[in-house]
């Protein structure tokens, strides 16, 4: 369950994204000073990098929206990747019918209007639909790229290097600077600091940096702090303007 007894702290109206992300993590680290533990891990992820990657992949727009929207639903997301690999969402009968209609309309007067739309406009829509079905190899390749991306896990000071090698390998026009991350220290006090591309899938409102702190006490690993950036949550809750925000919560019943 994500419902817990918590104490939260946040920066509403965040103006300096990177500094404010660092401030939230630093405040989280300070809150550990009175806790007794032998070791722990600060895990950092970033939902924004995933969404940018998806936007650059060679798949139909509807698939980009689908994958970004359901990133946080891990089981369903895995099912989507399987469908992407097999083209199981594409009905060959419907595709063939669309092609026939398209070829028939090519012979008609382009200025004619059907149901409020010109033949020319309808042809453009048909052309897009016909081109949408993917070659099987393309779907498999895109799924492979996404799966490999989500397996990236490394010390935080190697995050930019590992990501950039990955982007270069698959000829993705994207470069990440190490300064993009809130810290480059692999160890802070008793905590190992790692970067994980698959972390951040627990709550759908995160939009950028996400993190958690787990500590080891009495041979048990316990989650004590979770947080991240949620730049759209306040507008989703009714605000007329977008208000950037970043925050975290300390679990009281860990």
PLM feature spans:
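Internal, well-ordered alpha-helical segments in soluble enzyme and binding-protein domains
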Residues: 24, 28, 46-49, 67, ...
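Short C-terminal domain-edge/linker segments immediately following a structured domain
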Residues: 17-19, 39-41, 72-75
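Short glycine-rich phosphate-binding loop at a beta-alpha junction
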Residues: 41-44, 194
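Acidic, His- and aromatic-enriched active-site or binding-groove loops in soluble protein domains
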Residues: 58-90, 215-217
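Positively charged, Gly/Ser-enriched RNA/tRNA-binding surfaces
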Residues: 1-37, 89-254
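Beta-rich nucleic-acid/ligand-interaction surfaces
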Residues: 43-56, 199-208
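Hydrophobic mid-domain F-helix/FG-region of cytochrome P450s
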Residues: 27-35, 48-58
